[in-house]
């Protein structure tokens, strides 16, 4: 109720302003009622990159480059071939200094055979003393009249509250916040788990040896790997640049049969999506063939930077004909082998519909939960929004939104 009242108040305030203006000024009174700041909202431009990048770095966002901005907002297939808007996003300024930013990446989607123009949030960051104005960026994002579907696939709990106040909804895919994972390096994972428990020094050194033995014993029942592919299936490790007609035929077949919302896939889009300038997170593409016909593929992304002492490989995309469990198993086996070869300590699977997850449950992965579901959506038209409130309407995974777009 409070969130709804807040949302209405925000909307009323914004609509009262002149929407034709590209700048919106808001004054902040101090405790004695004096105006101490004048915050302006405007669209971001390419020349704003250095200051926005510096601010994002200060606030804990990852590295970026002007070349990557050109990739996202000039070379984007949704802009070049889908007539999507090339709007970078919005920023907050105080006395000419940038104090907040929210990007908007145009993307192509399909739902029940109809194409959709979507936009994904990215790099949402506001300096602490200006976070009372964060909602201005979010409301500007949702005011894009050319956009049919709005997505935030990587919302923090704080950002999620702002999205909810703007009447965006949490993804109805109930298991999205539950991450499945396989331990590939038991000793390093044991040390990580012990540090999370607050142990240090000798206790960690001794505990990781015991933990390794426990995890190796547990692998008889948990953390299992599928067997090698059957004779009828062939799994290949192929470069993204090699995809051609066979891939287009495969995704077209899936698209025509699919009743779920699906981010557009093509050889051009996958190459654009995963091959960012100065990419620190290399990908491996595995394709699966049955009787010479492509029947599925998996994209594995390796995160070279460690997260709390762990190196991760993540299943960034997975599409399989008829959700065939034998194809899922063959691709999972290839992904696990490649992740271990690359030096990953764990392999993670985030999202995907229950039919795919049920195929993965056969191999008894471990699981952990995020503090909250990070995926929010909002459709411009009521009919589409209502349809997307059903879990069966989604095929959400890290390929959606901006989750795997950054270098």
Task: Please identify what each model-predicted range represents.
Residues 49, 63, 131-132, 325-329:
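Loop/helix-junction capping segments adjacent to catalytic residues or to phosphate/diphosphate-binding pockets
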Residues 39-124, 233-320:
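A conserved beta-strand-loop-helix scaffold within acyl/acetyltransferase catalytic domains
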Residues 95-96, 144-145, 341:
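Secondary-structure boundary elements
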Residues 2, 6, 11-18, 33, ...:
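Active-site/acyl-donor-binding loops of N-acyltransferases
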Residues 100, 106-110, 115-180:
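Internal, well-ordered domain-core segments that constitute the primary functional module
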Residues 2-6, 10-47, 214-245:
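Conserved N-terminal entry element of GNAT/NAT acetyltransferase domains
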């Amino acid at each position: 109720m409070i969130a709804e009242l807040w949302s209405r108040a925000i909307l009323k305030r914004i609509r009262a302003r002149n929407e034709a203006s590209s700048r919106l000024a808001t004054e902040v009174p101090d405790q004695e009622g004096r105006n101490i700041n004048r915050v302006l909202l405007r669209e971001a431009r390419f020349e704003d990159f250095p200051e926005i990048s510096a601010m994002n770095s200060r606030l804990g966002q990852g590295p970026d480059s002007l070349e990557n901005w050109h990739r996202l907002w000039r070379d984007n297939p949704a802009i070049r071939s889908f007539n999507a808007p090339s709007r970078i996003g919005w920023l907050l300024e105080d006395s000419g200094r940038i104090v907040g930013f929210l990007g908007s990446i145009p993307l192509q989607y399909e739902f029940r055979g109809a194409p959709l123009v979507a936009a994904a949030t990215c790099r949402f960051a506001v300096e602490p003393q200006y976070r009372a104005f964060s909602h201005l960026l979010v409301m500007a994002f949702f005011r894009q009249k050319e956009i049919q579907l709005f997505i935030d696939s990587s919302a923090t709990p704080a950002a999620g509250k702002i999205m909810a106040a703007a009447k965006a909804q949490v993804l109805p895919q109930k298991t999205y916040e539950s991450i499945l994972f396989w331990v590939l390096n038991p000793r390093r994972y044991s040390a990580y788990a012990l540090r999370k428990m607050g142990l240090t020094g000798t206790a960690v050194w001794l505990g990781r040896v015991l933990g390794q033995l426990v995890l190796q014993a547990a692998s008889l029942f948990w953390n299992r790997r599928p067997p090698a592919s059957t004779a009828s299936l062939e799994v290949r490790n192929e470069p993204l640049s090699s995809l051609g007609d066979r891939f287009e035929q495969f995704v077209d077949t899936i698209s025509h049969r699919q009743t779920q919302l699906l981010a557009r896939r093509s050889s051009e889009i996958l190459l654009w999506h995963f091959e960012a300038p100065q990419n620190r997170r290399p990908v491996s593409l595995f394709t699966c063939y049955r009787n010479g016909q492509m029947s599925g593929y998996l994209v594995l992304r390796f995160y070279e930077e460690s997260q709390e002492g762990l190196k991760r490989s993540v299943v960034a995309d997975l599409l399989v004909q008829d959700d065939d469990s034998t194809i899922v198993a063959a691709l999972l086996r290839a992904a696990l082998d490649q992740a271990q070869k690359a030096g990953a300590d764990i392999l993670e699977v985030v999202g995907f519909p229950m039919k795919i997850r049920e195929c993965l449950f056969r191999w008894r992965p471990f699981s952990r939960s995020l503090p909250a579901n990070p995926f929010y959506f909002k459709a411009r038209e009521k009919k589409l929004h209502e349809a997307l409130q059903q879990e069966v309407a989604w095929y959400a995974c890290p390929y959606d939104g901006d989750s795997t777009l950054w270098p």
